[in-house]
Amino acid sequence: LDNDLFKGFKDHKTDGGNKKMFLWVTESRKFDGGAVDNIKKHLDEVLETFEQIWTHNDELLQLSPKFKWTPAYGVYIKDFAIHPKTKMASMITSNKRWTRQHEIRHDFAMANKDKIDVFGRGIQEIPNKEIGLVDYRFSFCVENDTYDTYFTEKILDCFATGTVPIYMGTPKVAEYFNTDGII
């Protein structure tokens, strides 16, 4: 395929030719760095430049049929399987405290680190997320932001390892997943 995929509108320069160009808007509203405003400001150019624009942002999805819904991120797990479970609960987090959800996640992890296994940047770093999920029956997942169309690898990685997510994120989680497998 002769295509280019860009994760930011301002980075959309190509080497020329007849490549089809696609834009993927991945960050939550709290971290988009003005991407949504920039896209709206240059909407005609965006629509002319890109074959499709993939996003979870409901505001952008209303602008044109070229905007297509997709989860904010994919899956970081390499070995999709329902693995045997030998441990009770984990949480993958970081020491970031930039948003309210970061604070909730961090405070919960620190308050419960003697009861659950806590992993993540600045806490107990792991080389891959499988280490913090594969052996665990449950994992606490708190998204960086909470709105209807936004969820990330935090919940998807649990499904990919057969781990039940204890989830704080989109209030419309039932529109995307069977909630019998989510707490």
What are the language-model segments listed below?
Residues 1-183:
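Nucleotide-sugar donor-binding catalytic core of glycosyltransferases
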